[in-house]
Amino acid sequence: MAQKEKIVEINGLIDHTNLKQNATAEDIKKLCAEAKQYKFATVAINSCWVSLAHAELEGSGVGITSCVGFPLGAASTAAKVAEAKQSVADGTTEIDMVINGGHLVAGDDDYVISDIKAVVEAAGSVPVKVILECCLLDDEQIVRACKDCMAAGAAFVKTSTGFSTGGATVHDVALMKQTVGDTCKVKAAVVAVGRDGAFRGLFVA
């Protein structure tokens, strides 16, 4: 495989991301232009920009990942559902929702499952990835979070938001994959600053 083809193949696994709170419309347009140029899988953006991204990316083959309950996951279920429904109406092709970490750590798995399931149902045919924020969890909590996601019908489990104390680690990704098997896919959130550290995490799952 030629080097250029390898780059395109790798780029097709990456969500090109701008989730900054001060991102402007021009920033999102630039993100979309880069995603089209380099053939990234999706642009990952805050939900207020989905309609703009949809217009910018129409016909390009690049998807849109709208982030719901981002970055804390502490919004009410009703708020997450409303955000998911609006994102779908605006043209998102994927949803990244953040798990309710407080209820998870407290052992309230019924709440966690209900919260995720409500968003999955609101999203309809749009796949939902659930961000666990692994840097705040121990191994037992990561395993339990993965099981809750499977029970709720999530399509993916994802390591982190990029807004907390750490990102993906090989250990966390391997533990998640071991737990979900083929029931869910696993996604590592990494900053692609170097081929070794960044992409090791990406390809474990």
Give the predicted meaning of each segment.
Residues 3-38, 42, 48-188, 195-205:
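Alpha/beta enzyme core
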